[in-house]
Amino acid sequence: MQFAPLLLGVFLLCGSARGSDSSASNAITCFTRGLDLRKETEDVLCPANCPLWQFYVFGDGIYASLSSVCGAAIHRGVITNAGGAVRVQTLPGQENYPAVHANGIQSQVLSRWASSFSVTPGTNNLALEAVGRSVATARPATGKRPKKTLEKKAGNKDCKADIAFLIDGSYNIGQRRFNLQKNFVGKVAVMLGIGTEGPHVGVVQASEHPKIEFYLKNFTAAKEVLFAIKELGFRGGNSNTGKALKHAAQKFFSMENGARKGIPKIIVVFLDGWPSDDLEEAGIVAREFGVNVFIVSVAKPTTEELGMVQDIGFIDKAVCRNNGFFSYQMPSWFGTTKYVKPLVQKLCSHEQMLCSKTCYNSVNIGFLIDGSSSVGESNFRLMLEFISNVAKAFEISDIGSKIATVQFTYDQRTEFSFTDYTTKEKVLSAIRNIRYMSGGTATGDAISFTTRNVFGPVKDGANKNFLVILTDGQSYDDVRGPAVAAQKAGITVFSVGVAWAPLDDLKDMASEPRESHTFFTREFTGLEQMVPDVIRGICKDFLDSKQ
């Protein structure tokens, strides 16, 4: 009988351990989410030393179920990063999960989710700690492997884009077609290849008032995005697409909300029928913010309905460019699978994103060309070919890059200013038609003239200003002072010398670092080889200015 208490104690200890398998001893990983748990109330054990910066937490007090359980527990103050026992209570979904910084974790905003959970201190701490020690390096006491969390994949690295799907949530589309629209958007999202190093997506719903459903930063896995799209609710109201587009262009693509530097910004606008408001102004705002707008129109107005449309040209005025690439039509929301791949191919065509703010479409380049007698007519033509080849690399438009040219001898002549031509074809034609002046060489006066009269009117614009000086000889006046003044006015100066142009003068005119802003060739035929270097120099300076 003396062994009975001992045996009873062993039995109770083992029974307690077995009981903890089903209720209190569920060891989880740092990234187990609320939706990974299957019980309404569950006691779990969080491990120690979780990387706080990797937690995804949505809400405060009540957390969306896609939040990390351990992250939420630390955020709430239930445990520290030393780990510990947590009781998780499943709750209904809700709207407007807030963003709050607490205990080293920044939770994120989420507009709506289907289920939630709360966290409180766990029970049976001693049993949990014992189990925790036994599974510190292997598996939980149940003998089962820990639940796998969603692996973050790199995604399609050939399709780097930040994309907002602006879906139609108006009464025009109705609940049934709204669900079909969500299915189509989900298919597009999957085919894009969403991932940490691939495309990131978010959703904005257009209705009476626009609503950002989730941001770029909220999800970087296709499964998460699919689930979030599935949970979107239909809002109803007028199809104020213009209002939603303007709101998205201004608010959606901030660095705080997940936008990435150097990645094209895209808004894909889904429109069932036609908008209730004006899209032209919204399109202008989007282009000013460097956003590439696509319009996917479904069930376009019939002939009888055209009288109800405010502006039948609303698509052409809203898209990034009216060249056919940015507009996409589907006859209905039924049988849309075949339209998924062509749309994805468009969205992944990085080189076609003409409205992104890049060095190619966000600069003003002024060419100051030497027309002195030492150049000669034939060499002057080679100089014009040089500036034409540089200009060809840039997207010239009324909202993009702009080109101006000044020819100088002792005098100066503005061949054309930044506002004279807004297409590449017209700029190249104007360059071809420049007539050789012949005369002396007063480069310093020409720099001052160009700074004042050519760059002066655009100094407060959005584009970055560049001056490329092309000369074949020594100036009769001072060049350093005027060049410094130009640089103080915000103009980056590149100097290109040919033949007898003194290297000291070229460096005196060039911006810092002078070595990378100074070019020289003995022969005029060597100018052609410098074209890529000058273009790269402009783009490097542009990118550096954006850091």
UniProtKB/Swiss-Prot annotation:
- Where is the protein localized? Secreted
Its tissue distribution reads: Expressed in inner ear structures; the spindle-shaped cells of the basilar papilla. Weaker expression found in the inferior and superior fibrocartilaginous plates and skeletal muscle.
One short Pfam family name for this protein?
A: VWA
Please list the GO terms describing molecular function.
Answer: collagen binding
Write down any Gene Ontology CC term: collagen-containing extracellular matrix
Keyword annotations for this protein, in alphabetical order, are: Disulfide bond, Glycoprotein, Repeat, Secreted, Signal
What PANTHER family does UniProt report for this protein, alphabetically? COCHLIN, COLLAGEN ALPHA
Q: What is the purpose of this protein?
A: Plays a role in the control of cell shape and motility in the trabecular meshwork.
Kindly state the subunit structure of this protein. Monomer.
Name this polypeptide is given = Cochlin
- Which species is the source of this protein? Gallus gallus
